[in-house]
């Protein structure tokens, strides 16, 4: 795996982790509509990370 590929994979993992943290905060604030959006974002980030992992693995 090249350095650029590792960087892309690390960025995808970072986005996945940060979106989960944001989701937790939004739930604590009872911001349901925003939490729903963030949950979709997290699901997409998770899918992206899995896809990149498989492709670049």
Q: Positions of the model-derived regions?
A:
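Short, charge-rich amphipathic interface segments used for partner binding and complex assembly
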Residues: 3, 11-57
